[in-house]
Amino acid sequence: MRCPFCGAEDTSVVDSRISEEGARIRRRRRCVECEKRFTTYETVELRFPQVIKQDGNRVEFNREKLYTSFARALHKRPVPTGQVDAAIERILQKLLGSGVQEISSRTIGEWVMQELYSLDKVAYIRFASVYRSFEDVGDFQEVIREVQSSPQNGDGPSS
C-alpha cells in the first residue's frame, strides 16, 4: 500500500485487529521509506443485485430507500430501533444471499411487507396502502381483515 505521507510503495503491516462487530479489520502500517505510521481499514465490498423497477428500468440497489420505507411506515410507532435495524439487515442478507444479479422491486417490497407485518401491524397497513396503491376505503378494510384474521405469531401476510 502506498504511504500517504511520502508516496512510497513499500509499507509493512505492524498490527492487525478485527473490529468489535467483526465487519472490518484495522491495520497499523509503517512506511519503509519515511518510517511514519498510519492506519487502514479493510472491509468486504458488497455487491447488491440491480433492481428491476415495475416499468422495466434497472437501477442500482439503494439501501437508503429501504431505510426510508421503514421510517415512513413506522413513523411515531413504538418499535425499537434495534428491531428495525435487524429487519433491514435480514432483507440485506436475503439480497446478498440470493446470488442473483437482478431482482424485482416487487420481491423487495414483499420482503419489506413481511418484516413490517412482524414488527407492527399499523406500519404494515401504512406500507401496504402505498405499495399496493390503495384507491378506496375498501382496500384498507380488506387488508385490515387480513391482519385481524391471521394468527398473532404468523410469519406474514399471504401475497
Swiss-Prot record:
GO terms for biological process: negative regulation of DNA-templated transcription. Coiled coil: none annotated. InterPro entries: ATP-cone_dom, NrdR-like_N, RNR_NrdR-like. Binds 1 zinc ion. PROSITE patterns: ATP_CONE. GO terms for molecular function: ATP binding; DNA binding; zinc ion binding. Pfam families: ATP-cone (PF03477), Zn_ribbon_NrdR (PF22811). Its cofactor is Zn(2+). It comes from the Bacteria. The keyword Transmembrane does not apply. A zinc finger (unnamed) spans 3-34. Keywords: ATP-binding, DNA-binding, Metal-binding, Nucleotide-binding, Repressor, Transcription, Transcription regulation, Zinc, Zinc-finger. Residues 49-139 form the ATP-cone domain. PANTHER family: TRANSCRIPTIONAL REPRESSOR NRDR (PTHR30455:SF2). Belongs to the NrdR family. HAMAP family: NrdR (MF_00440). NCBIfam families: transcriptional regulator NrdR (TIGR00244). Negatively regulates transcription of bacterial ribonucleotide reductase nrd genes and operons by binding to NrdR-boxes. This is Transcriptional repressor NrdR. The lineage of its organism: Bacteria, Pseudomonadati, Pseudomonadota, Betaproteobacteria, Nitrosomonadales.
